[in-house]
Amino acid sequence: MFRIASRQTRNLRALSSSKNWARSLVNTRSFRAAASVQNNNAQIGEMVDKISSLSLLETSELVKQLKEKLNIAEIAPMAAVAPAVASAAPSEEKAPEEKKEEKTTWNLKLESFDAGSKAKVIKEVKSLLGLSLVDAKKFVESAPKVLKENILKEDAEAIKSKLEKLSCKVVLE
């Protein structure tokens, strides 16, 4: 900052001592830079005025031509979704050739139960989920409801077989 101030002071001293101070002022570097900035700002201001007077269709055409001239690629509005959609299409074609990955985690859903075995179902749900008797009763009565989420297939099948023995309808999702 000190250098800038001393340079400006030097320029002012040179101007005040010279007879043709106007010519000296125009020849200083800082004045030329300021003049070019003003010219650029004037040009930009004119462009802004012209662009703002364009209609929506004309603006769209302007954007299209600028993209072509500057070699700007089209970008999808949801860039994260576009690659996923693009990669999903080829995999559907290869699906018959490749084996589908087997689901590793399952959700166990209690669909319905026999009213005669309600007490046994409540006890089983109480022990499976670690709920109090009242909470287990409310859970069973609010069926259909997800019993357990993200459990292994073997565990889900074991629980399903226990509940089916109590005449419950259980679904693996």
Swiss-Prot record:
Gene Ontology CC: mitochondrial large ribosomal subunit; mitochondrion
Keywords attached to this entry: Mitochondrion, Ribonucleoprotein, Ribosomal protein, Transit peptide
Pfam families, per database record: Ribosomal_L12, Ribosomal_L12_N
Domain of life the protein comes from: Eukaryota
CDD domains: Ribosomal_L7_L12 (cd00387)
GO MF annotation terms: mRNA binding; structural constituent of ribosome
Matches recorded under InterPro entries: Ribosomal_bL12, Ribosomal_bL12_C, Ribosomal_bL12_C/ClpS-like, Ribosomal_bL12_oligo, Ribosomal_bL12_oligo_N_sf
A single GO BP: mitochondrial translation
FT transit peptide: 1-33
Compartment(s) of residence: Mitochondrion
HAMAP family cross-referenced by the UniProt entry: Ribosomal_bL12
Record-stated family: Belongs to the bacterial ribosomal protein bL12 family.
PANTHER family (UniProt xref): 39S RIBOSOMAL PROTEIN L12, LARGE RIBOSOMAL SUBUNIT PROTEIN BL12M
Purpose: Component of the mitochondrial ribosome (mitoribosome), a dedicated translation machinery responsible for the synthesis of mitochondrial genome-encoded proteins, including at least some of the essential transmembrane subunits of the mitochondrial respiratory chain. The mitoribosomes are attached to the mitochondrial inner membrane and translation products are cotranslationally integrated into the membrane.
Quaternary structure annotation from Swiss-Prot or TrEMBL: Component of the mitochondrial large ribosomal subunit (mt-LSU). Mature yeast 74S mitochondrial ribosomes consist of a small (37S) and a large (54S) subunit. The 37S small subunit contains a 15S ribosomal RNA (15S mt-rRNA) and at least 32 different proteins. The 54S large subunit contains a 21S rRNA (21S mt-rRNA) and at least 45 different proteins.
Name the record gives this protein: Large ribosomal subunit protein bL12m
Record organism: Schizosaccharomyces pombe (strain 972 / ATCC 24843)
Lineage of source species: Eukaryota, Fungi, Dikarya, Ascomycota, Taphrinomycotina
